[in-house]
A protein has these predicted regions:
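Bilayer-spanning, highly hydrophobic alpha-helical transmembrane segments
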Residues: 99-109, 336-364, 376-394, 682-711
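Conserved cytosolic catalytic loops of P-type ATPases
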Residues: 33-55, 59, 191, 220-314, ...
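Signature of the cytosolic headpiece of P-type E1-E2 ATPases
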Residues: 105, 468, 477-589, 604
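Actuator/coupling domain of P-type ATPases
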Residues: 60-82, 122-125, 129-229, 233, ...
Length: 739
């Protein structure tokens, strides 16, 4: 398939209850012609599918999923709302079924355990069992049948089979007790096992759904930032419309205290806006005509008119939500092993149950038929693919959600796994270690300098987008300088800029450009230049031909949090490397200020990638932290790429991890989050595997020959319910842990 024709979509799936369900949905979607890849996440109840829309449509995918008893929500505009409504409806049904199950299961259990010798008790138990089997347990049997028709199986298969065996065996013994009496045996009934199993499984599902709902609180908070309506200005009148109906170019009125509905630019008025939910910065930002504003942020005290530039799924907030959803729906590398286990889990359990039954019959004969049946039923009931299926995705969901709440955006599960292995962190200086707001702090003029040169320098730097160029432009603007007319402009990557005016060539840039033109620093300036470098200043050299005219000293303040962040990273065993295009003395000064282990100076953008390669060649696992703009090659080369953004400058598509604020203290938090989330995944998987490895043999009766202990199917169902709930609760515990 041509990947250019492919579309990647995320659709909510309803009706899934266990890992086998998720695996079956994944399998059926992958079988469809035109589907390149499909991945189902049980915890988020979502399908991520890559397909060719010319070959297969979302409706066809929906129909394929419905054939095996599930449903796909393909209405993208209302998918979130539909999913919430479906979840609420399912939870309500589950609650009703659970209440009905216990209302009838409890008297059945009492009759079965304490009043077995009362005449006609079997008939009373049968009547009381029917609402549990036919109403509360109906979905188990319906889903199991649909799975069977598709030659697949899941947890519903195990529950349906175990309760059917217990109920049908009891039904036979109620109607035909003579069959056993004629053979000298007692006709036992197990209505209480069938009903209580269903009741316990439903309780487990109810608790699981409640707990799973809490794992998605982060995404719900983000979605809560999206306003439902906007006030559009048309022909001088204001009209409230739904966000979905808002178009690019519409004029929108925003009043004090309101959430901004879409991304756009202010065309009238000024205000202060609280951007903390996006940028993490607590202080409101002043906005005036021409400034950009973001959807979901809150207007403080001024009214303004804005033009909508990005609406719907194209806003920064929508991108953040989509990124978090996709990350929560991604699979950790270890999940591939779990998927292979869960794919064969139910068939293996069925085989173990049959084997258990046969061993009991062979060992004990017909006298042990009841023991054989109870043990087989217990094996079917206690086996829990849910715990295995939920172990990884619930931990990821909580971890990635907690990251989003802390303004740490993690692209996928692989990024979390990789971050845990990082031992070396490379920090780009400008905008990462420093504030990224350089200001001119000094001018050194050489002998050839004339006042008219300022206009030429101004004109040259106006055409450059480099942060240092912007600082020079700002300084000259404050002096009231006017840009001169220049004839040509050339940008030299990692070096600077070259312009011509008449028959003269002027240049401005780093010491490399100084050398390229064969210019030298006079003895008069040399000492002062060294002093500037030693104090951590960045230097821009300006000259004509082979003559140096001026040296501009530019200061970019080190962030208050940089030293503390580096300290925390070093305490966790990380090796810190400072990377900069500045000269040796400047780099040495900044590295000393933050206490980096090592610094690399004079690095061109292309050199930065080689630095990462060299560190990796030393056997290091490297994380590169930059602004995601001028160090994209190095970010791509690193084992983990981390971009720092702020407000409208968030470069979410660039890196595996995006820190949404300029606070470098988020970096050690991100590493802690990775470590804790991956550790949680391993804990969940360990206990899920251990539960099944111990529970299934005990249910089969392995303890009976030694201690006379035989597990009751009712206890087995309670244990199964607790196992999946405990996995979800363990994942939720991450919410209460400090980063």
């Amino acid at each position: 398939m041509n990947m250019n024709d492919m579309t990647k979509k995320l659709y909510p799936v309803t009706g899934m209850h266990c890992a086998a369900c998720a695996g079956n949905v994944e399998k059926i979607v992958r079988k469809q012609e035109g589907v390149e890849n499909a991945s189902v996440n049980l915890a988020t109840a979502t399908l991520t599918v890559t397909y060719n829309p010319d070959i297969v449509s979302p409706q066809q995918l929906k129909e394929a999923v419905m054939k095996i008893g599930f449903d796909l929500i393909i209405d993208e505009d209302n998918s979130v709302q539909e999913q919430e409504e479906a979840e609420q409806s399912y939870y309500g049904q589950l609650k009703r079924k659970t209440i009905v199950a216990w209302i009838f299961a409890l008297p059945v259990a009492v009759l079965g355990m304490f009043l077995m010798n009362v005449p006609g008790v079997n008939w009373w138990m049968l009547l009381l069992s029917l609402p549990v089997i036919l109403y509360s347990g109906r979905s188990f049997y319906m889903n199991a049948w649909k799975q069977t028709l598709q030659r697949t199986s899941n947890m519903d298969t195990l529950v349906a089979l175990s309760t059917s065996i217990a109920f049908l065996f009891s039904l036979f013994n109620t109607f035909y007790p003579e069959f056993w009496y004629s053979r000298g045996l007692e006709p036992h009934v197990y209505y209480e096992a069938a009903t209580v199993i269903i009741a316990f499984v439903l309780v487990g599902k109810l608790m699981e759904e409640k707990a799973k709902g809490k794992t998605s609180t982060a995404i719900r908070k983000l979605m809560g930032l999206q306003p439902r309506t906007a006030r559009v200005v048309k022909d001088g009148r204001e009209e409230d419309i739904l966000i979905a109906d808002l178009q690019v170019g519409d004029k929108v009125s925003v009043r004090p205290g309101e959430q901004i509905p879409v991304d756009g630019v202010i065309v009238g008025g000024n205000t202060f806006i609280d951007e903390s939910m996006i940028s993490g910065e607590p202080i409101p930002v002043e906005k005036k005509q021409g400034d950009k504003v973001l959807a979901g942020t809150i207007n403080q005290n001024g009214a303004f008119i804005m033009t909508a530039q990005k609406v719907g799924k194209n806003t920064v907030l929508a991108q953040i939500i989509r990124m978090v959803q996709e990350a929560q729906g991604s699979k950790a590398p270890v999940q591939r092993i779990v998927d292979k286990v869960t794919a064969v889990f139910v068939p293996v359990v069925l085989a173990v149950a049959v084997f258990t039954f046969l061993v009991w019959i062979v060992a004990g004969g017909a006298d042990d038929f009841s023991y054989a049946m109870l043990s087989a039923v217990s094996v079917l009931v206690i086996a829990c693919p849910c715990a295995l299926g939920l172990a990884t995705p619930t931990a990821l969901m909580v971890g990635i959600g907690k990251g989003a709440e802390s303004h740490i955006l993690i692209k996928d599960a692989v990024a979390l796994e990789q971050m845990r292995k990082v031992d070396t962190v490379v920090l780009d200086k400008t905008g990462t270690v420093t504030e990224g707001r350089p200001v001119v702090t000094g001018w050194l003029h050489d002998a050839g300098w004339q006042n008219e040169h300022k206009g030429i320098l101004y004109a040259a730097e106006l055409k450059s987008e480099h942060p240092l160029a912007l600082a020079i432009v700002e300084a000259l603007k404050k002096e009231g300088e006017k840009p001169a007319i220049i004839d040509s402009f050339e940008s030299r990557t990692g070096r600077g800029i070259v312009v011509t005016r008449g028959n003269k060539t002027f240049w401005a840039g780093s010491h490399r450009l100084l050398k390229d033109f064969g210019a030298g620093i006079s003895d008069l300036l040399k000492g002062m230049v060294e002093d500037y470098e030693k104090s951590g200043k960045s230097l821009v050299y300006f000259g004509e031909g082979n003559t140096l005219l001026a040296v501009i000293a530019i200061s970019d303040k080190i962030k208050d949090t940089s030293r503390q962040a580096v300290k925390q990273l070093k305490e966790s065993g990380k090796y810190i490397v400072l990377l900069t295009g500045d000269g040796h003395l400047t780099a040495q000064n900044v590295a000393g200020e933050i206490d980096a282990n090592r610094f690399i100076s004079d690095a061109l953008p292309a050199d930065k990638e080689n630095v990462i390669k060299e560190l990796q060649a030393e056997g290091r696992v490297v994380a590169m932290v930059g602004d995601g703009i001028n160090d994209s090659q190095a970010l791509a080369r690193a084992n983990v790429s981390i971009a720092m953004g702020k407000g409208t400058d968030i470069a979410m598509d660039v890196a595996m991890v995006t820190l949404m604020t300029s606070d470098l203290l988020l970096l050690p938090k991100a590493f802690k989050l990775s470590y804790k989330t991956v550790r949680l995944i391993h804990q969940n998987l360990f206990w899920a595997f251990i539960y099944n490895l111990i529970g299934i043999p005990v249910a089969a009766g392995i303890l009976f020959p030694l201690y006379g202990i035989l597990l009751n199917p009712m206890i087995a169902s309670a244990a199964m319910a607790c196992s999946s709930v405990s996995v979800v609760l363990n994942s939720l515990s991450l919410n209460w842990r400090k980063l």
